[in-house]
Amino acid sequence: MAQIAATKIAMVGLPEEAGDKFPSQLSGGMCKRSGLARSLALDPEILFLDEPTAGLDPIAAAAFDRLIGDLKASLGLTVVMATHDLDTLFAICDRVAVLVDKKIRIGTLADHLEDPHPWIRAYFHGPRGRAALDGNSQQHSAIDVGSQSLAGLA
């Protein structure tokens, strides 16, 4: 059991001594990583996350997004996440479910970016959506949105 804990603690980027500490002795970001290590302890195929970057500063949130993306790729995880963080959405998600008009719309980010529904347009193309799109396009290759790229939507 100790070896599994040490492996998962290292996997999420925590120092070895973090395993001997109480949550009150860890920073907010370290607590998030500790919770993630606990979630990975049983080697799940599906990882459920609820607002994983809530309470983190932008630098720590971006690092956590990269960690989730790396774990998703290296472990073959399916990640089901509830988030309102557009940066996280654009950094991690392959498919997105949006609740609008008491219905769930599921699609790729490109699908939602092209959706004509006023609320979806306001959410994904508003100031925060444009900032997330622009930040994502500068960090990664452009996501095709029909005949437009992310840079063309800002």
Please annotate each region the language model reported.
Residues 89-91:
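A short, surface-exposed alpha-helical micro-motif characterized by mixed small hydrophobic
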Residues 62-74:
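Helical segment within the ABC ATPase nucleotide-binding domain
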Residues 83-84:
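H-loop/switch region of ABC-family ATPase nucleotide-binding domains
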